[in-house]
Regions:
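Interfacial/gating helices of multi-pass transporter permease domains
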Residues: 33-55, 82-85, 125, 188-193, ...
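Hydrophobic alpha-helical transmembrane segments
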Residues: 19, 161-213, 273, 386-391, ...
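Membrane-proximal transmembrane or re-entrant/amphipathic helices at the cytosolic face
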Residues: 2, 432-437, 456-514
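Helix-loop junctions and terminal segments of transmembrane helices
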Residues: 61-77, 152, 214-215, 272, ...
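N-terminal membrane topogenesis motif
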Residues: 1-27, 80-91, 126, 222-243, ...
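Interhelical loop/hinge segments that connect adjacent transmembrane helices in multipass membrane
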Residues: 1-9, 188, 204-250, 293, ...
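Transmembrane helical elements of multi-pass membrane transporters/channels
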Residues: 11-28, 166, 191-210, 225-296, ...
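Signature of the first transmembrane helix
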Residues: 8-73, 101-105, 136, 171, ...
């Protein structure tokens, strides 16, 4: 069973990484074109207004995690009723979408009119972007139960095709923006409408495809009785608390930056966050590919298999992260200027470095997050995480009030994440008798040794006299090869290297390369 599970996870991972590579490459081009077409100020407005929407769309994140978890658990049960669980989640999402719409059209409009710091003459554009973003947020919430079906059935190929198609469409629309509406007074409004088009396409596709593939599951059948929703809503409540703290930490900090600094600093934070998201997506995709297997193992009562899988996922995610982190760190200044061009907002480089450090600490939760959700007893995990994340906002406010630079709040993120991981292990041991030493040794020890060796390498690398674009690109490639060699020789065990070398596709490739 473990072998079949590994094969399915590997297949899902390959599909997800193909999607990720395409979307990141296209996204990098799109980001640069948007900066050229709109300018740093309008990009900052779009980011700040989007933060206001994201801050109140925390319900979406909470309901998404709940839906995927309960559907996977239902799939793992021998007598699971997926149609009943789908209808419970669908009803909950529709109510959540209505609640978000009400919040956005009241408190959100108040924020835009009274608190948002925008250049003169741009208030109307900000309100237009806000209304478009409101519609997009509500559609995304209503779409979650249908998209979750593709996740629990491990139809990652379909999800990948939809995401790739959406990314390519966005690129084509941005090219049209550059050609026909570059530096146009209405450019920001046109861009907002263009970005909403992909959401409408996804919404229609997932609804129609779900009714084609799983008509019995999506068949509308009202589930009566409060008990049917109590467990889902209780789980959602704690996820809601956690999601609100995460959004407050990221998007709320964006609003804090807007209050103390200019919109160009918002743009720098936006691009640093974009880089962090790209790196985290590279890692979290493997985590996502393993989620159905891990959760269904716990649902079937096989806790040992679930914990073993969580430890393995954590180590592999850390190794994948290191393959990106050190090459990026070695040539970050050059790569950001290559990506964004001469119009790169000030402070982007320093914010990006701290964002990478935030990601480095965050990735240590890979596998653990899925395992905790699968266990189901999430109350204290969500409470402690949310408390630490929310404390970052007042800490950032105090730092900004005393004149500290914009990146100071990212330092708060790093400290909060370190404390969060320590408390998570304490809770896991207390609530589930989880063997923390076994997990730490198996998940963190090998990556930690690679980190030490790569830090020595980076210290020596900085002494090299690199001049010209090709020398910097060669240095980036060299750092990647050195890190990859350490991941292969130290990060993977002897049995893992042996299995990879014996894999039929690897053997076939080696024969053809001779």
């Amino acid at each position: 069973m473990a072998g079949r599970s590994d094969i399915r996870i590997a297949k899902n991972t390959v599909i997800i990484y193909v999607r990720m590579i395409v979307t990141i490459l296209v996204g990098l081009v799109t980001s640069r074109l948007v900066l050229q077409a709109l300018g740093a100020s309008d990009v900052g407005i779009y980011s700040a207004v989007g933060s206001a929407v994201a801050l109140v769309s925390i319900i979406s994140g909470a309901l998404t995690g709940t839906t995927v978890r309960f559907m996977n658990i239902e799939m793992g049960k021998p007598d699971g009723d997926l149609n009943r669980m789908f209808n419970v989640c669908h009803t909950t999402h529709l109510c959540g979408a209505a609640l978000i719409f009400l919040i956005l059209e009241t408190l959100g409009i108040w924020y835009i009119h009274t608190q948002l710091n925008v250049p003169p003459g741009k208030a109307g554009d900000a309100m237009f972007v806000f209304q478009v973003s409101t519609v997009v947020a509500c559609l995304n919430i209503a779409n979650v139960p249908f998209q979750s079906l593709f996740n629990v059935h491990e139809k990652f190929g379909t999800i990948a095709l939809v995401d790739i198609a959406n990314t390519v469409v966005k690129l084509l629309l941005v090219l049209a923006l550059c050609l026909f509406w570059r530096e146009s007074p209405a450019g920001l409004r046109i861009y907002a409408v263009m970005m909403s088009a992909a959401t409408w396409v996804s919404f229609l596709f997932y609804h129609l495809a779900s009714r084609k593939y799983w008509p019995d599951t999506v068949r509308w059948h009202p589930v009566k009785g409060g008990s049917a929703y109590r467990e889902v809503l209780s789980f959602s409540g704690y996820n809601l608390l956690f999601s609100s703290s995460m959004i407050a930490r990221t998007q709320g900090s964006n609003m804090l930056i807007n209050a103390f600094f200019s919109t160009t600093v918002n743009a720098a934070y936006f691009y640093a966050s974009t880089l962090q998201n790209y790196v985290m997506n590279f890692v979290s995709n493997f985590d996502a590919a393993s989620a159905p297997q891990l959760t269904q193992s716990i649902g079937a009562g096989d806790n040992g298999q679930g914990e073993l899988l969580a430890r393995r996922v954590c180590r592999v995610c850390l190794l994948l992260f290191l393959l990106l982190f050190f090459p990026l760190w070695s040539e970050l200044d050059f790569l950001l200027r290559l990506w964004l061009g001469a119009g790169i907002p000030p402070d982007t480089v320093v914010m990006s470095r701290w964002s990478l450090l935030v990601a480095a600490v965050s990735v240590t939760s890979a596998g653990l997050f899925q395992l905790i959700n699968a266990y189901g007893r999430i109350k204290w995990f969500k409470v402690e995480s949310s408390t630490l994340f929310l404390l970052c906002l007042p800490a950032g406010y105090l730092l900004y009030r005393d004149g500290f630079p914009a990146y100071s709040i990212l330092i708060c993120f790093v400290v909060a994440d370190i404390l969060n991981r320590i408390i998570q292990f304490i809770l896991l041991r207390a609530l589930f008798r989880f063997d923390v030493g076994w997990f730490v040794k198996g998940a963190y020890l090998r990556p930690a040794l690679i980190v030490l060796l790569m830090c020595v390498y980076i210290a020596a690398y900085r002494r090299l006299p690199l001049e010209g674009a090709w020398m910097h690109l060669a240095g980036f490639a060299l750092t990647f090869l050195v890190c990859a060699a350490l991941v292969w020789g130290i990060g993977l065990s002897r049995s893992e290297r042996s299995r990879l070398l014996r894999h039929p596709r690897v053997v076939s490739f080696l024969k053809r390369s001779r």
